Amino acid sequence: MTFDGAIGIDLGTTYSCVGVWQNERLDIIANDQGNRTTPSYVAFTDSERLIGDAAKNQVAMNPHNTVFDAKRLIGRKFNDSVVQSDMKHWPFKVTTKGDDKPVISVQYRGEEKTFTPEEISSMVLLKMKETAEAYLGKQVKKAVVTVPAYFNDSQRQATKDAGTIAGLEVVRIINEPTAAAIAYGLDKGDDGKERNVLIFDLGGGTFDVTLLTIDRGIFEVKATNGDTHLGGEDFDNRLVTFFTEEFKRKNKGKNLASSHRALRRLRTACERAKRTLSSATQATIEIDALFENIDFQATITRARFEELCGDLFRSTIQPVERVLQDAKMDKRSVHDVVLVGGSTRIPKVQSLVSDFFGGKELNKSINPDEAVAYGAAVQAFILTGGKSKQTEGLLLLDVTPLTLGIETAGGVMTALIKRNTTIPTKKSQIFSTYADNQPGVHIQVFEGERAMTKDCHLLGTFDLSGIPPAPRGVPQIEVTFDLDANGILNVSAEEKGTGKRNQITITNDKGRLSKD
């Protein structure tokens, strides 16, 4: 039996969650351990592959072959500075096969194996698919998968590929804060008044801010911003560094960082202490025989934790200012500020946001861990033709987070689609040659907000050749950008005189484009 609808999957940096709409209600599905969220962890041993809780539970014994944080690698290049700095915190080995794409190498069943970030993510997606199948008692073929709103084209495409590898037809990629807004909007009900809602989504690895208006079932995103590399993991890292130094001080300079197992046990204790500090003002860490048989005990206060992560917490406010600016909205016009993501439980984060909005009461009505999967599942139901009184008339109008354009003479970034444009969208512009009798043009596609392409992100390039000889500026070359509802880009170019055309879909292999 095949389930004829689609499931909604929140593929998170640290935890993932799956939901399904059936019988007029939405269910967030518990996994085989009874947990409604599943760690985004995959482990390889001499005999098997483990995914989820089973993988995370054995991480201290098997740190080199337990992979997590694939979302911090997906769609990025190996020599990206972010990847290079993350590698310092990871016990597993990340290398590249010379094409600047990162691969993770592990020992599996006694031999060395390498996996791409998409393959690791596909294993987590597979686990979520199986969790849903066990619950539904049917095979699942389709899913809506969420990504951070600030994910770029490569990261979106790579996430879609991960779904395909997991045997899922990804009906749509949707933005996490927008999915959370659906959960919020459905939960709140409709009073017929337009509301301006700001979603503040701080998770395990990523941060998004989205400003939207909700009016009679229409969810219209006005602006989005964020940091694809900020979240709970970064706060854990600060604690790990702090306690590593503390251990050195108490034990004649012994450095526990030389042991991956010790570091992992410390990290697990730090994650626990961080959670404790959201409800208590101090937390104690106790680990027996942490390193060279030395027991470790230490206490940290909430105030100290806030000091260690102060710059990170404060950095969440700038994207909030940016979305208001982009949407040309005054902060006093925001009706609801909705918190999403586990890291929004941190009291300091809450007080910073509340203070920014003049002491406003924040909205905590939706479950910060489940809202994204909830919204994704509602969208999955609608996109597969589901009809319900509760969801009828629901329409999502999302935007593209980054400006898209091409390079023109002198390395100038010429924008075709500006950031925060509603998607799907299609824009064309006429360009010409800059030399007499120029036989072809080399079209380079970029995304980013800077004036020069060298400061933007190259998505890909292609050539349009066979232009008949003509003086410079005479040939008419129409370049068209077509951005679909997933936020994935197709670019085509046509020489008007001859009707010659060429096009590309920006694929996950950056710079190596699939010619249609």
Curated annotation (Swiss-Prot):
Keyword annotations of the record: ATP-binding, Nucleotide-binding, Stress response
Gene Ontology molecular function, alphabetical: ATP binding; ATP-dependent protein folding chaperone
SUPFAM superfamilies assigned: Actin-like ATPase domain, Heat shock protein 70kD (HSP70), peptide-binding domain
Keyword Nucleotide-binding annotated: yes
Domain of life: Eukaryota
Pfam family, one: HSP70
NCBIfam families assigned: PRK00290.1
Family: Belongs to the heat shock protein 70 family.
Designated name of the protein: Heat shock 70 kDa protein
Species this protein is from: Leishmania major
